[in-house]
Amino acid sequence: MINFRGRFGRPLWHYLVLPVVLLLLAVILLTPMIVQTESTLKIRPNQQGLSLPDGFYLYQHLNGRGIHIKSIIPENDSLVVSLEFPEQQMQAIEVLQDVLPAGYAIVASESKKRHRLLPVFRSNQQNLG
């Protein structure tokens, strides 16, 4: 019979339990940080002749009512407003409906966004050479 004993006379699996438990604990604790839901509002004109609203104008009104904004980005004939807190999405829609004139569609969406813990290791062509 083969005796698999470690250096101090304990079975080898005793030495593997602590690293495995620590690894599982790290995965459980870091998963919410890596995958977060991001709440966005997409604003686009419904009628011909309407242009996109000014992002700074929207920012002033949303910020004035206590809604925290991550970013406001133009994208494919629409304006995408990323909110800091998903809980404020309905309140932001109400503010935008009050501020914007008729003819704009406001579509809410939530997406899971992956954050990189170590952005240094991203494959970036500019860093090569």
Swiss-Prot record:
Gene Ontology MF terms in the entry: protein kinase binding
InterPro entries on file: Modulator_MzrA, SecD-TM
Membrane topology: Single-pass membrane protein
Cytoplasmic-side segments: 1-14
Subcellular location: Cell inner membrane
Segments on the Periplasmic side according to the record's topology features: 36-129
Membrane spanning residue stretches: 15-35
Family membership noted in the UniProt record: Belongs to the MzrA family.
Subunit record text: Interacts with EnvZ.
Function field: Modulates the activity of the EnvZ/OmpR two-component regulatory system, probably by directly modulating EnvZ enzymatic activity and increasing stability of phosphorylated OmpR.
HAMAP family reported for this sequence: Modulator_MzrA (MF_00904)
Protein name listed in UniProt: Modulator protein MzrA
Organism for this UniProt entry: Yersinia pestis (strain Pestoides F)
Name of the gene encoding the protein in the UniProt record: mzrA
